[in-house]
Amino acid sequence: MSNNQRKDTLLSVLNLSPVVQGGTIAESFRNSMDLARRAEEWGYHRYWLAEHHNIEGVASSATAVLIGHIAGGTKKIRVGSGGIMLPNHSSLVIAEQFGTLETLYPGRIDLGLGRAPGTDQLTARALRRNINSGEDFPEQLEELRNYFKPSGNVRNQVRAIPGEGIDVPIWLLGSSGFSARLAGELGLPFAFAAHFSPANTVPALELYRNSFTPSDVLDEPYAMVGVTIIAADTNEKAQHLATSHYQRFLDLVRGTPNQLKPPVEDMDQIWSPYEKAMVNEQLSSTIVGGPEEVKAKLEDFVKTTQADEIMVNSETFEHADRMRSFEIIADVWKNR
């Protein structure tokens, strides 16, 4: 990839509306709006929210509702789901929700779709999802697309009102090869979760590009890659701030998802060598550092992945540090 091509790589924001230890969900929502407005000023292209359930430290479970809230408080940044876990929902309801959002905020809504539960099995059952729901994802996706663009006579069909005839860009999200291949075969844009599945990143992207078939949506493959970046004014501060993110994943490894914890001086006082290895393996794509470190590592990441767009996740305990992180990332990318 040439420098000119990399210059054109867009930056976007992934937000899980983190709830910090001692904080409130209301504060999380206010911070999410603040970040969206500033991200728009800093030149980020999209702002996506992710569906997760029964996780005390993640407040974006009612994803479509939050998308409407964020879109209503911003002016031009694209807002969408990164993603909606389609097997948790009726395709009809998702078509109606996103048809409504696109009608309210025309030309600004994205519908990113995944097939994972976004939660544990007990919560999945509470969502009325059965254990094999993900296997039906291609059929459910086709059903959803037909609600937006029905084929044939619609007189005797169930219709999505609003939704029918509305152009909502659909993305497929994934952390393995299944969605990569499906996105390629359908000619849809693909977003890969390198921020928690780094080992599968390059193989999945190659599979997507190799299986790509031009469609009425895309003439060429378009790949967005998610990555966690913790940026600060110095390498030392960034490393300190990143310990909140490490603790987040350590809690997941231990099966005890929690609110986002404050940074610590020494992670080795908290995790075992085995846990450290597990977290570091899962977060091996994470970029942590000051401006120059972030710039160099992000350029290498784009060169390796050939990404058309980068979706940045940046979680720190203090909201001001998170805002500064996103500001630094935007600044070094714009001025490289």
From Swiss-Prot:
Among CDD domains, the record links this protein to: Flavin_utilizing_monoxygenases
InterPro entries with a match to the protein in the record: Bact_Lucif_Oxidored (IPR050766), CmoO-like (IPR019949), Luciferase-like_dom (IPR011251), Luciferase-like_sf (IPR036661)
Q: Which SUPFAM superfamilies match?
A: Bacterial luciferase-like
Which Gene3D superfamilies does the protein's record reference? Luciferase-like domain (3.20.20.30)
Entry's Pfam families?
A: Bac_luciferase (PF00296)
In its UniProt record, a GO molecular function of this protein is: oxidoreductase activity, acting on paired donors, with incorporation or reduction of molecular oxygen
Q: Got a GO cellular component term for this one?
A: cytosol
Its family? To bacterial alkanal monooxygenase alpha and beta chains.
This protein is called Uncharacterized protein YvbT
Q: What would be the name of the gene that encodes this protein?
A: yvbT
